[in-house]
Amino acid sequence: MSSKMIRVQRLHSILISGLNLSCKTRHRSSHNTQLFRFQFDPSAKLGLDIASCLLTRAPNGQNAEGKTKYVIRPYTPISDPDAKGYFDLMIKVYPEGKMSQHFASLKPGDVVEVKGPIEKLRYKPNMKKHIGMIAGGTGITPMLQVIEAILKNPDDNTQVSLLYANVSPDDILLKKKLDVLAASHPNLKIFYTVDNPTNDWTGGKGYISKDMAVKGLPEPGDDTLILVCGPPGMMKQISGDKAKDYSQGELTGILKELGYTESMVYKF
């Protein structure tokens, strides 16, 4: 794959075969999360469908035959798909995470192999009257894509309710941006909860509970969709994880107990 900038209007089709894209900047978002900006032709836009993700690939040693091994991980950009010349990835860095450690070693000018897109939810304006979201940690990234698509479209009347769980107040990613969006858009409601609250914390305390879901999400119904994205423990508690073949899998957990059906829930 070439590291040269490709002069096209949309990178979408070219990404299918893969590109090496240069890291322009990196910033600390929290104690274990960093924001990376990757650049390409400034006249082009990424052009991904809403909530689609990209695959990133990095070398990871050699196999018994001396050939390079690779680690591959999906990430959802948090930047506007129509932004020209760049996209942003928010990466949580795990001590044993092979790909996240690779990202943590990047310096401006270094390149990352990117391929995709992988389409997730096929969002259409007004596809549901009310969308509820349950996110944990970096599980906020696909939610932000959907939220911004709804809010920037004056013809989209969808009501959005977000329950966002984190370990501590300092771990809440993109909180300032989310708060600004909620303050300026009455169709967006957000409830934060943390495991380890500070003395001045006024939001929820503990894991997302059945009571939080009842109070913060739209009721089950044909015009309701609940989106879920977070770490495995949260997924198990809320909805059950996806199947081994990455299909949606059986709906279990709190959402099933509250009467939601598989057609009302989408797991990222």
For the regions a protein language model found, what residue spans apply to each?
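Ferredoxin-reductase
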Residues: R7-D110, N166-S168, D195-N196
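Short, conserved phosphate/pyrophosphate- and ester-handling motifs at nucleotide-, phospho-/glycolipid
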Residues: A51, G139, P231
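A short, basic/flexible loop-to-alpha-helix module at the beginning of a structural domain
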Residues: G116-K128
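Structural motif
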Residues: H130-G132, S161, L225
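Hydrophobic/small residue at the entry helix of a nucleotide-binding pocket
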Residues: T138-M143, M234
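Histidine-anchored nucleotide/phosphate-binding helix
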Residues: P142-P154
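Reductase modules of NAD(P)H-dependent flavoproteins
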Residues: L163-F268
